[in-house]
Design a protein with these regions (language model features):
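Concave beta-strand-loop units of leucine-rich repeat
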Residues: 49-62, 68-88, 92-111, 115-134, ...
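Charge-rich, solvent-exposed alpha-helical interaction surfaces
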Residues: 32-35, 65, 69
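Terminal hydrophobic membrane-targeting helix
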Residues: 44-47
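Ser/Thr/Pro/Gly-rich low-complexity linker/stalk segments immediately outside membranes or between
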Residues: 24-39
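Short, conserved loop/helix-junction motifs that constitute active-site signature segments
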Residues: 367-368, 390
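Small-residue (G/S/T/A) turn/hinge positions that recur once per unit in extracellular repeat modules
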Residues: 41-42, 275
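N-terminal Sec-pathway targeting helices
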Residues: 1-13
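Hydrophobic alpha-helical membrane-insertion segments, chiefly the h-region
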Residues: 14-23
Length: 404
């Protein structure tokens, strides 16, 4: 009997200790949350499967004290430091190994991301528009990192990243001082954005990116070519605006390319170099000063074709080859006069002839039953001239506004 009593007392004592510890832990957590909110203005959201912490306090210079408080609350998944004006370093973040995402967008004082190396669960890092950030070599040994966004980090001159085997998305938009890029360490990349990297002169290892689907090198005006581009068998979207490419043969060999954006290329006179792009559905050509003919347009272009501000384009002859085209935009083609071939685009839904001053009439509206919108602002067509026209689609809208 006495033995049973002792066992009961022992079990009861253990239960009391557990209850006390539980109450203490709840109080400790509550106090930590209160301090995070009062001292750092933290925003805390704890859902069933996600612990989010947002903080942009001017008191925040590093993460050491913040991390100490956060650990008393739990294991955070997402740390959002966007807009923190005084944050200089991420030192202290290493004490939060449960983090899957660290976001520090527009942190004007951030100069180092010390502490992120080796965080085992991290899948996303975003330091967009943190202009003082120059050294990112400490971003390494992150086995699960999928997305790295350094867009607008204008101080970065080189990229020495190691130990990122899972990296799929690399965003370097507007890193204007970045000189060279070696992609050999990132064979799994799916998206690469270097748009606006005016100082970039070479991209090595491009041809080895067998899984790349999106490539944006627009306004990376220091590049003179894209060696290896023809090997990008999975590429779907390619943006080359304001990048002078001497040889388009590699691009013409991309079997899955669906969207091609180009602009400012002086070498393009016709679309014949692109005619082999059987999967292409959208074609954007902007301000190509010598484009004179649409002959050779890939026949599969159906969702959108735009040839805007091309001063030598005088006729739309050749466009009829893209018989399934739904949206045609020739805005700003000041010398365009002949639009008759549009009548053969039986699937056309919208056309823009804005600022095409030599276009005086739109007889094609009589033959296109799917056409819904004709944009004519600043063209040579006057409103009175379309009154009473027999329309294939009685609900057709003529829009004479000019949008800048």
């Amino acid at each position: 009997m006495q033995k049973a009593v002792r066992v009961f007392v022992l079990l009861f004592s253990i239960l009391v200790v557990i209850v006390i510890l539980s109450l203490w832990k709840k109080a400790e957590r509550k106090n930590a949350i209160a301090e995070l909110e009062s001292r750092f203005g933290a925003q805390i959201s704890i859902q069933e499967k996600e612990f989010y912490l947002g903080c942009s306090s001017p008191e925040l210079k590093d993460l050491k004290e913040l991390a100490s408080l956060v650990k008393r609350v739990g294991e955070p998944d997402i740390l959002d430091l966007t807009g923190s004006p005084s944050l200089v370093t991420l030192a202290g973040v290493e004490d939060l190994p449960s983090l899957t995402s660290v976001v520090a967008i527009d942190c004007p004082s951030l100069v180092t991301v010390e502490g992120v190396s080796g965080l085992p669960a991290l899948t996303q890092l975003a330091f967009t528009d943190s202009a003082q950030l120059t050294d990112v070599s400490v971003i390494r040994d992150l086995p699960n990192l999928v997305t790295l966004d350094l867009s607008g980090c204008v101080g970065i001159t080189s990229l020495d990243l190691q130990g990122l085997p899972a990296l799929e998305n690399l965003y370097l938009s507007r890193c204007r001082q970045l000189k060279a890029l070696d992609l050999s360490a990132f064979p799994g990349l799916r998206q690469l954005y270097t748009d606006g990297c005016a100082g970039l002169t070479t991209i090595d290892g491009l041809g080895a990116l067998a899984n790349l689907t999106d490539l944006d090198v627009s306004n990376a005006s220091g590049l003179t070519g894209l060696p290896g581009v023809e090997k990008l068998a999975e590429l779907i979207v390619l943006d080359l605006r304001n990048l002078e490419i001497e040889d388009l043969s590699g691009i013409a060999r991309l079997p899955k390319l669906r969207v091609l954006r180009m602009g400012g290329q002086e070498k393009i006179e016709t679309l014949e170099p692109l005619s082999s792009l059987a999967s292409l559905r959208e074609l954007h050509l902007e301000a190509c000063p010598n484009l004179r003919s649409l002959k050779g347009i890939p026949t599969g272009v159906s969702q959108y074709a735009g040839f805007t501000y091309c001063p030598k384009l005088v006729s739309l002859e050749g466009i009829e080859a893209a018989g399934g085209l739904e949206h045609l935009d020739v805005t700003g083609c000041e010398n365009l006069a002949e639009v008759g071939p549009v009548a053969k685009l039986s699937s056309l839904v919208q056309i823009s002839l804005v600022k095409c001053r030599l276009v005086k009439a739109v007889p094609f509206v009589e033959k296109l039953p799917k056409l819904r919108i004709v944009m004519l602002g600043g063209s040579g067509v006057v409103p009175v001239s379309v009154e009473g026209l027999p329309l294939a689609n009685e609900e057709l809208i003529f829009d004479f506004t000019i949008s800048e």
